[in-house]
């Protein structure tokens, strides 16, 4: 259980950091945080650059970024729920774990599709690696023995 809980904790922490850096990025965009603030993801600018070839309305990148923030918040809630349920039950609560990883993998799948649509192949490579790493983790959590 300790190894599995460690894997779940790692991905929970990683998702928390990702959400926090994206929140800081969003706060920079709306000028709540100063432009010199360094703890920010730069993902909003990446969305603007990736979509500019399609000449979207100015509000489209903000809507996309806001949607990602909401999705990432739900992922973090899912991982928190999976952690609490697993600790309380004394073993991996695979139902809650599956929900958390399902939310995360679905966001990564959406990123991969959008990367392809926007021909952002370098970015897509990173998303594919995260997708594979999370898929391997969820399989390990399901297949490895309880002990």
Language model segments and positions:
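Extended, low-polarity transmembrane helix blocks
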Residues: 1-21, 63-70, 74-147
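Short alpha-helical interface elements
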Residues: 31-34, 38-48, 58, 89-92, ...
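Select transmembrane alpha-helical segments in multipass membrane proteins
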Residues: 55-64
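Long, hydrophobic N-terminal alpha-helical segment
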Residues: 1-56
């Amino acid at each position: 259980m300790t190894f599995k809980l460690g894997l779940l904790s790692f991905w929970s922490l990683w998702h928390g950091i990702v959400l926090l850096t994206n929140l800081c990025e969003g706060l920079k965009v709306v000028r709540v945080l100063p432009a010199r603030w360094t703890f920010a993801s730069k993902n909003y600018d990446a969305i603007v650059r990736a979509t500019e070839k399609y000449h979207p309305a100015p509000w489209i990148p903000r809507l996309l970024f806001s949607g990602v923030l909401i999705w990432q918040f739900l992922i973090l809630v899912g991982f928190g729920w999976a952690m609490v349920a697993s600790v309380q039950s004394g073993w991996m609560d695979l139902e809650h774990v599956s929900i958390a990883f399902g939310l995360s993998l679905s966001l990564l799948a959406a990123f991969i599709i959008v990367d392809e649509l926007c021909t952002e192949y370098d970015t897509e490579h990173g998303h594919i690696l995260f997708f594979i790493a999370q898929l391997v983790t969820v399989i390990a959590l399901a297949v490895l023995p309880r002990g």
